[in-house]
């Protein structure tokens, strides 16, 4: 870790680290560990309007210089006074990032560290096999005393064999580092909830402990509470079982350890899934036999219909959901879409959220990491905003709706179906269960899950039908891409199949029961190398509208449909996804592409207040102080979710740095020559309107660590962080040691 004992020097502008030296900006200005950074910022003021003067060709507005705009396509149009290099050198200093790497493993066909000629290549793309160090106290405190008064420990199940500390005073003196002085030394969790779930391990414990003297003269250390701040439904300070110590105030969908243990030992029965899967195997064999016969399609369909057997189970009536222009959607984001980040976005106006994608098989195996992804904050289990202007389902009850849904993926129908039954049984606060059919990363794709399902429409349909049958009242949705390959787009046929069912079986099977489809306007092959294709999304939106109308006619001409297989009264919602970076993008897509709503992904990580802009219908030029306040909130929300002890605090630090790896890419609109901003435009080297704004734009990850230290205290000596997606600047830093 770099020393902070350095002389004060001006912060270099964004990009200068690559052009001049590799010394981080925060090494050139001393930052204290105070809750508010010592960098002073001038209050935000309206920009003075210059008096009209004769303009030279170079001074004309960019709208009048289309040729210049074309020459600089892909480069953020930053005003000349903020550039630190001549305009002719702008393209050379523009930051290059790899958002494909941020999603997971390598892109299709990526080679290893050595090229075809055997020579070692320069590192680029994703940092694979990243390590973050080990975060632990010097001496471990036993759970039997971690939340109890000094003289009233609980029984230690390890007895004399326990190698953890049982002496609280010794632990506080020798077993951990001293209390932190950020936030004035007061525990953010205790200040919010009136108690701290980290107990004696909290790195702010001195703010919520006291020493009491008994009549016999003995002095005892006890933890304190503030009853006025404790909510009735909050978890107890002392967990009834030490394994449930991860229960946090304001966090829902926490599955009991006993359930996860039973899953890992295969002691949980999936009665509905087992019945349905047994029927599905017979039906699939029947379909296979008929479709291999040398007959016309009509004859095959008739033969299949004649021998078709109804499934043993029917779907339960689903809770109605709603998507509209007033319900912007936060995408399920790997790594970035954690609970503290979703909480921040909901606070700023996100109306619908999803968990990070979980793998179905680890869920069925009871793995803690995947079940942790299923947790929701209390703000996510409230109803979404509902101010409809068009025709909506009259049976929709907004008071029963909620914001939070979970996303899973699977490579086999039995995994998807059993996962849906398990999630619906043990998670009481679910809006939907979303099946990811678009994840492009190699590990998922090569297993047959994610975007591999785009080329297996029959298997995908069986998954949706089965999940819908066993998920109780929870609707099932799907997220797809345009296709796997650029020259073979499959989304239109797939959307029809999800809306109506396969043409040859829909007469007997009805609709699969998919409540909504989200289409990402890219192929797997394309990834983020090109802009999202909203014209194709618009074509699919028009098809969905016709399919919804067609579903009504099919009900009239074939047979009376089972209401339980028709979520939302027979209407399938359609959501578009890709490159939404402002309210202008959002409403343009809703009004012109005719989607029900828009899902926001990277745009929300770069500027979470995009949801605030959508609600306000205008651009918001956030000051550096306001943006730093979002970083502070993330830190507080992280400690509430993961704990204020050594482990939880550095878990928060790790995900805060992941957040900053996108957050720093925001270019304030006050610095741009023209609007709207484009998310894929790369910013050249520039300086902000003040030192703090310049610091927040730094692409040096060492600066991000220093920013985290403003709110989380000094990083441990063994803490490590490497950005998930590298840029040229990161390579230079590593090359220069």
Curated annotation (Swiss-Prot):
Q: Name one GO biological process term.
A: mRNA processing
What does it catalyze? 5,6-dihydrouridine(47) in tRNA + NAD(+) = uridine(47) in tRNA + NADH + H(+); 5,6-dihydrouridine(47) in tRNA + NADP(+) = uridine(47) in tRNA + NADPH + H(+); a 5,6-dihydrouridine in mRNA + NAD(+) = a uridine in mRNA + NADH + H(+); a 5,6-dihydrouridine in mRNA + NADP(+) = a uridine in mRNA + NADPH + H(+)
Q: What is this protein called?
A: tRNA-dihydrouridine(47) synthase [NAD(P)(+)]
Pfam families from the xrefs? Dus
**Higher taxonomy:** Eukaryota, Fungi, Dikarya, Ascomycota, Pezizomycotina
What's this protein's function?
Catalyzes the synthesis of dihydrouridine, a modified base found in the D-loop of most tRNAs. Specifically modifies U47 in cytoplasmic tRNAs. Catalyzes the synthesis of dihydrouridine in some mRNAs, thereby affecting their translation.
Residue ranges, compositional bias (Low complexity): 35-44
Main subcellular location of this protein, as a coarse class = cytoplasm
* Record has Zinc as a keyword: yes
Offer an example of a GO molecular function term for this protein.
tRNA-dihydrouridine47 synthase activity
The alphabetical list of record keywords is: Cytoplasm, Flavoprotein, FMN, Metal-binding, mRNA processing, NAD, NADP, Nucleus, Oxidoreductase, Repeat, tRNA processing, Zinc, Zinc-finger
Active site positions, chain numbering: 439
